[in-house]
Amino acid sequence: MSTIISIRDLKKQFGDKWVTQGVNLDIPEGMMTVIIGRSGEGKSVLLKQVIGLIHPTSGEVLFKGINISKLSDRELEEQFKHIGYVFQFAALLDSLNTFENVGITLLENGMKAQDVLPIVKEKLSLVNLSEETLYKYPSELSGGMRKRVGLARTLVTNPEIILYDEPTTGLDPITARVIHELMYDMQKKLKLTSVVISHDLEIFKYADKVALLNDGKIAYFGDAKTIWESDNPYIYQFIRGLPEGPIQTEVAHFKDKF
């Protein structure tokens, strides 16, 4: 099992608050790794440090052995051709139709619309969207369809890795399962590496590895298939939703007042 991303002692400070406080994590190539943790724990900040949207205070991120934390913006842009990012909300431009939203990167780089069209059609097919959606606007699409359009847009650059930030936020359980299955199928079919931030424990069915972020550090890293059997106190408490344990929660503090 080879490592495609290595995170080494990654720290990030905003003002007087430390968000990540020495994260160490190896992301295995060709697998789905899910990162879980309390709300406000800094999972999205961690992901954005991985792709250079936020620069770490200290530490490093290695992509295929290259320390991307030290690269210039131009060098980062070159590396990011290999990495796709799916935002928590689809982040589609309301003024653009599906074709334009999916193909925007190619169109902005000077490709002709007639050359972009077959590429967009192919990516829409991969996420199970028909050509009928090509010229529809985000307001005409369901929440699940917008998520899939966002994924198709990520696929346009043929990434090796896709980072997902809460991909099923705002979706009902049925649609969320459809998105999870799609993510899994895409990973296997295209031989992708997936890193997923999620609060939806159903994702464990499709994941290979699970990492738990707590107090700015990785408190657990292990196999998703055996996670319910783990006796790690942090993961035991978190996946069962227990208010008491090593993870400090607002609920526990509230109970202490009575």
Predicted regions and their residues:
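Catalytic Walker B motif of ABC-type/P-loop ATPase nucleotide-binding domains
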Residues: 162-165
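Helix-to-loop junction immediately C-terminal to a conserved catalytic motif
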Residues: 51
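Conserved ABC ATPase "signature" region
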Residues: 66-67, 114-132
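Conserved catalytic motifs of ABC-family nucleotide-binding domains
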Residues: 158
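Conserved ABC transporter NBD signature motif
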Residues: 59-67
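Conserved ABC ATPase signature
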Residues: 137-141, 145
